[in-house]
């Protein structure tokens, strides 16, 4: 049975690409036709590519690898957080902080600061500190949680990146490429597919499309984890 059906893709609007004037010619092989000034993505290719990406994600998870979900555009933020959390993986859904991968040690220092403030909040330290200081610490905690909350338990570099809109997330993509971390990505008609190891040609602007595809990637991870549980049980 295939991972995803044409009907599901159509209903979520996965086939709608960008306007024809905003395209990357390298995406030509994934385009079916042009309609009213918009490129229509070839969903038969998307079905195959979702299947490929699903298998890649499942295999990485089965080997105990961690996958970092990245999507900071408005349409992706919620799905990225929800599906990464459901799969027990990590995510960045606000702003990608430069050096998140290439300067991971520095990022870890900021995560340590985040955890230190959390501990202070939990162990009663806040109760004995001046009110003004507590207000500042809470603000700092809020900011750190916003940007680093999704990776605060990530001990090392991820085994792979799942990215929504590599054009928007070009810094994350560049960092992963520099470190030879494989990238699985939802790639629209205005993106460069050559930068992505496993391309899912799809509409990256519709919330339903992003949610559908991201949930399938989370399903792949959960399938691998359930397989492990069956083996150990």
From Swiss-Prot:
Pfam families: Ribosomal_S2. It comes from the Bacteria. One of its GO terms (biological process) is translation. GO terms for molecular function: structural constituent of ribosome. InterPro entries: Ribosomal_uS2, Ribosomal_uS2_bac/mit/plastid, Ribosomal_uS2_CS, Ribosomal_uS2_flav_dom_sf. Coiled coil: none annotated. Keywords: Ribonucleoprotein, Ribosomal protein. GO terms for cellular component: cytosolic small ribosomal subunit. PANTHER family: 30S RIBOSOMAL PROTEIN S2 PROKARYOTIC AND ORGANELLAR (PTHR12534), SMALL RIBOSOMAL SUBUNIT PROTEIN US2M (PTHR12534:SF0). Belongs to the universal ribosomal protein uS2 family. This is Small ribosomal subunit protein uS2. It comes from Bacillus cytotoxicus (strain DSM 22905 / CIP 110041 / 391-98 / NVH 391-98).
């Amino acid at each position: 049975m295939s991972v995803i059906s044409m009907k599901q893709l159509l209903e979520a609007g996965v086939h709608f690409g960008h306007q024809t004037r905003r395209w990357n010619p390298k995406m030509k092989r994934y385009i079916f036709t042009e309609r009213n000034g918009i490129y229509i993505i070839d969903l038969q290719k998307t079905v195959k590519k979702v299947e490929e990406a699903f298998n890649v994600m499942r295999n990485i998870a089965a080997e105990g690898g961690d996958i970092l979900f990245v999507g900071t555009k408005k349409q992706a933020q919620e799905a990225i957080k929800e599906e990464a959390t459901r799969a027990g993986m990590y995510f960045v859904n606000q702003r990608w902080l430069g050096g998140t991968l290439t300067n991971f040690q520095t990022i870890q220092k900021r995560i340590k600061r985040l955890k230190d403030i959390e501990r202070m909040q939990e162990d009663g330290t806040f109760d004995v500190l001046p009110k003004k200081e507590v207000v500042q610490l809470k603000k700092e905690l809020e900011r750190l949680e916003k940007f680093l909350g999704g990776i605060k338990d990530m001990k090392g570099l991820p085994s792979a990146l799942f990215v929504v809109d590599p054009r928007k997330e070009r810094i994350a993509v560049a960092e992963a490429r520099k470190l030879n971390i494989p990238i699985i990505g939802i790639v629209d008609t205005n993106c460069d597919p050559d930068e992505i190891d496993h391309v899912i040609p799809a509409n990256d602007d519709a919330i339903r499309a992003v949610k559908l595809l991201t949930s399938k990637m989370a399903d792949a991870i959960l399938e691998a984890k359930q397989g492990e549980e069956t083996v150990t049980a």
